Amino acid sequence: MSSILDELDWRGLIAQSTDRDALAAELAAGPMTLYSGFDPTAPSLHAGHLVPLLTLRRFQQAGHRPIVLAGGATGMIGDPRDTGERTLQTADTVADWADRIRGQLERFVEFDESPTGAIVENNLSWTGALSTIEFLRDVGKYFSVNVMLDRDTVRRRLEGEGISYTEFSYMLLQANDYVQLRKRHGCALQIGGSDQWGNIVAGVRLVRQKLGDTVHAMTTPLVTDSEGKKFGKSTGGGNLWLDPEMTTPYAWYQYFINTADADVVNYLRWFTFLEAGELAELEEATRDRPHQRTAQRRLARELTTLVHGEDATRSVEHASQALFGRGELAALDEPTLAAALREASVAELTPSGPDLITDLLVATGLSASKGAARRTIAEGGVSVNNMKIDSDEWTPQASDFLHGRWLVLRRGKRNIAGVQRVG
């Protein structure tokens, strides 16, 4: 039987680790408690958080106990980043975001009374009670400023506009989290993204210096696509959020269904729990029959179900099929239809019009001009609610509007837009 480290290796999920042999030996000796931290720098986690979250889940399935740490304290400070100082949020805002994120964290690991049952902590519970004197004596005394200045992000910031003491001290707070979790739960491994390596190793050193214990560190790779672009950015450039109010399940599904062939197998390794044999079959399908997009559909289905549940997955799959002419639009509930259309483009239709099909195509951006719209119609490339339009004089009747106010326009096979009747 392969070890959890072997599993992570073949999936490509280990970027760096402290003494690998020592870590493997301790994992083999019995259940280990490990943790990963998530700062509430927004009201929701985003897709980039899935790698460490799912790594916690993999460890749990292998018989180990995960701790998910909400950064109620560190979220008020902010880890230094290359783009400059973070805007400090109020304590109430961070507390609200921490509560929301805690609820999201609880979806990804199992909470029960078993030895592997997950634990949720908030680092505000110990950091908030720490006085300035205690922080400087009990934590700061163990850190060399020279070492802290050598961190890549800090060095780049110092070469630019500089860095505040607030963000400079972040490493100390994160390191102290490891000490506290070691004392409270016997935690022996911290995992995080590879950009957190310096902070995590600082925690390993602090545990050794303060408690005399040897603990471990491991990072997962920062996920980029085959073109080097950061994973998890929506088509508009924003984050792909786990909160359905911030990124709809339809938009989430579409992001993954549109994954490039060059990326889809890696994403299946990193973000799903499919076994090696099935992944090999999906890799073969992508290589031999890329037009079928079998792997992309499986990826989108797995991740939408993981984050939003089976009902949401069925709903968005029905919506996707219906919007692209392979299902019944009238069967879609209005919230799903509206969310799907808003991810494309929606033009409003007022009682005063204009409502000629050529005007609607231009208003939604499906055609650059009325002349272009007429040509597309003449070529048979326009449909409304999956019904082909053969006249450039067509106007919608009341009975054409889905749920009394929506039209679905399509140009060609994949260009979709909506019209919403208002007023």
Swiss-Prot record:
A motif ('HIGH' region) lies at residues 40-49. Catalyzes the attachment of tyrosine to tRNA(Tyr) in a two-step reaction: tyrosine is first activated by ATP to form Tyr-AMP and then transferred to the acceptor end of tRNA(Tyr). HAMAP family: Tyr_tRNA_synth_type1. Residues 355-412 form the S4 RNA-binding domain. A motif ('KMSKS' region) lies at residues 230-234. Its main location: cytoplasm. GO terms for cellular component: cytosol. Belongs to the class-I aminoacyl-tRNA synthetase family. TyrS type 1 subfamily. Keywords: Aminoacyl-tRNA synthetase, ATP-binding, Cytoplasm, Ligase, Nucleotide-binding, Protein biosynthesis, RNA-binding. It catalyses: tRNA(Tyr) + L-tyrosine + ATP = L-tyrosyl-tRNA(Tyr) + AMP + diphosphate + H(+). Its EC number is 6.1.1.1. One of its GO terms (molecular function) is ATP binding. It is an enzyme of class 6 (ligase). The keyword Isomerase does not apply. InterPro entries: aa-tRNA-synth_I_CS (IPR001412), aa-tRNA-synth_Ic (IPR002305), Rossmann-like_a/b/a_fold (IPR014729), S4_RNA-bd (IPR002942), S4_RNA-bd_sf (IPR036986), SYY-like_C (IPR054608), Tyr-tRNA-ligase (IPR002307), Tyr-tRNA-ligase_bac-type (IPR024088). This is Tyrosine--tRNA ligase. L-tyrosine binds at residues 35, 170, 174. Homodimer. One of its GO terms (biological process) is tyrosyl-tRNA aminoacylation. It is found in: Cytoplasm. ATP binds at residue 233. It comes from Mycobacterium sp. (strain KMS).
